[in-house]
Swiss-Prot record:
This is GTP cyclohydrolase FolE2. Pathway: Cofactor biosynthesis; 7,8-dihydroneopterin triphosphate biosynthesis; 7,8-dihydroneopterin triphosphate from GTP: step 1/1. The keyword 4Fe-4S does not apply. InterPro entries: GTP_cyclohydrolase_FolE2, GTP_cyclohydrolase_FolE2/MptA. Keywords: Hydrolase. Its EC number is 3.5.4.16. Pfam families: GCHY-1. It catalyses: GTP + H2O = 7,8-dihydroneopterin 3'-triphosphate + formate + H(+).
Length: 269
């Protein structure tokens, strides 16, 4: 077994000078699975598993970044995740990596306990959530993205049919840039309230009747869905910009109907 000479100094190759003089905009680690806890709107703590992407800007004269420091940051971040805690993580990463700019992104399943509309039975429904933050030129921007499954029912189908109307599951995806703390549940509520009907994990027969009739009484094209959600986001001062998408998985076609609205309130007329 080789014995290391106590006088030997292990070289730090990453910190050596790179003669090619080409900066790298983003370098780091991607798709790191790591457990985390999330602070919910009610103040409870929810355990989940996040998929993390962390990267920084690398100057032209530096050969490499310190990859292990990204994972060390996750190991040291044990407190429940909030928007402010996420902002602090981003600042800590820049200090640890001695970087002027960087980005952190984490995607995780988030569960909401929902009560059925008639029977009152409770069940969990999962949502895909992404929290992202980037710091550049002394400015920090935070983004909250939520994919919300809902039901949509076609107004045209209802109008032309003697009975019934085609309906389907849809995805509403809200990617919002935040001006202030905004609970995940707030974006979920906006999407669900503007859909033909929301979803539940568990329904009894009286609930299923309610859901069917609720959607029938509230038909919406994919265009209606994104416009109605956009109005809600426009009125929310906690959101400064957003990319909003709706996709209807059409039950009478082998393709989806799709719509997108993108708006930055800072540049609005």
């Amino acid at each position: 077994m080789n014995q290391m000479n106590p006088a030997f100094v292990m070289p730090d190759v990453q910190s050596t000078v790179d003669t090619r003089q080409i900066p790298i905009q983003r370098v780091g680690v991607k798709a790191v699975r790591h457990p985390l806890t999330v602070r919910t709107e009610s103040g409870d703590v929810q355990p989940t598993v996040g998929v993390w992407n962390l990267d920084v800007h690398l100057p032209a004269d530096q050969k490499g970044t310190h990859m292990s420091r990204f994972v060390a940051l996750l190991e040291d971040s044990r407190e429940p995740l909030t928007v402010e805690r996420f902002r602090a993580m981003l600042a800590s990463m820049l200090v640890r990596l001695e970087a002027e700019a960087g980005r952190i992104e984490v995607t995780f399943p988030y569960f909401v306990n929902k009560t059925a509309p008639v029977s009152g039975v409770q069940s969990l429904l999962d949502y895909e959530v992404t929290l992202a933050g980037e710091s550049r030129n002394g400015e920090t921007r935070l983004f909250l993205k939520v994919l919300v499954p809902v039901t949509s029912l076609c107004p045209c189908s209802k109008k032309i049919s003697q009975y019934g109307a085609h309906n389907q599951r849809s995805h509403v995806t809200i990617d919002a840039e935040l001006a202030a703390d905004l609970p995940v549940e707030a974006l979920i509520r906006i999407a669900e309230e503007e859909a033909s009907c929301e979803l539940w994990g568990l329904l009894k027969r009286p609930d299923e009747k309610f859901v069917t009739e609720r959607a029938y009484e509230n038909p919406k094209f994919v265009e209606d869905l994104v416009r109605d959600v956009a109005q809600r986001l426009d009125a929310d001062e906690r959101v400064v910009a957003y990319v909003l998408e709706a996709e209807n998985f059409e039950s009478i076609h082998n393709h989806s109907a799709y719509a997108l609205i993108e708006r930055d309130k800072r540049h609005a007329a």
